[in-house]
Amino acid sequence: MATCFAITASFAQGPGFHVINTFHIPSAGRWDYIAVSPVTDNIYVSHQTQVNILNKNTGDSVGVIPNTTGVHGIAFAPSFKKGFTSNGKLNTVTVFDIKTNAVQGEIKTGENPDAIMYDPYSKKVYTCNGKSKDLSVIDPATNTVVKTIELGGKPETAVSDEAGKLYINIEDKNEIAVVNTKTFVVERRWKIGKGDEPSGLAIDLKTKRLFAGCGNKLLIVVNAENGNVVKELPIGDGCDGVGFDAGLKYVYSSNGEGTLTVIKEKSANDFEVLENAPTKKGARTIAVDEKTHKIYLPTADFAAKQDPKQKRPDMMPGSFQILEVGK
């Protein structure tokens, strides 16, 4: 089990969002998504072969979920008292107890399950399978896959309107696919204007607006009722996650360049980019705690590239960390 500790940021507090704490996790491995538990004070972060669990108030290590090689995401089904991890290298989902974190089983899925989410309307868990280009639909009551939905493209992230529709970013098609969660049929495919390689996706359930973060430094606002592009907004480079705080009406884009783009939703059709708050290079995925209005971003320290052709810089050993961001 990795030991974690918190360091308070030493720089002066600015007028906007800033790093409040840094929670260090000295074990090795890269990461992907992070999630906030809806029933405890824990945050869960994917960490290559395991999921690290931290107390969000102190940064202390609570435990790990082991044997999740290639883990991407974490989802929670509170009514079933279960959590789920998507294990990309294993083509499986690990099921765990939402309070004790004890592993309860493993489910075979499509190839390379990436993002994972629970839809309270259909009472199903969905994995976005990047290699097989489909969704695995899991019944948490039985821990079985009950349907596979072909998407015809690489799914990146999915969100629900909690009223019978699922929206999925199709990264290699620059579109959003709309799935009926009663029939499990793809009903529509919407192009997203100038957006290229959509990754992060969030939704405002009240205004029925989708927020798609794209690889070409744009966030596309889409009407979830008809697919019309409402707004194209500038964001930082390297977005791989989008979060939404329904209470504050803030949309967040976590950018690998080391910034957090903060956008205010003034109304369903009126948006303003407030700032690109400094975070840290590599902080590209995000979890928003709507209870505390804090934001969590995993990243690490990196060595300088030895070869210009090197795709990613080497991660410094023992430097994995979670940034806590707020006002």
Residue positions per predicted region:
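Predominantly soluble domains enriched in secretory-pathway, periplasmic, or organellar proteins
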Residues: A9-K327
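Bacterial N-terminal signal peptides
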Residues: M1-A9
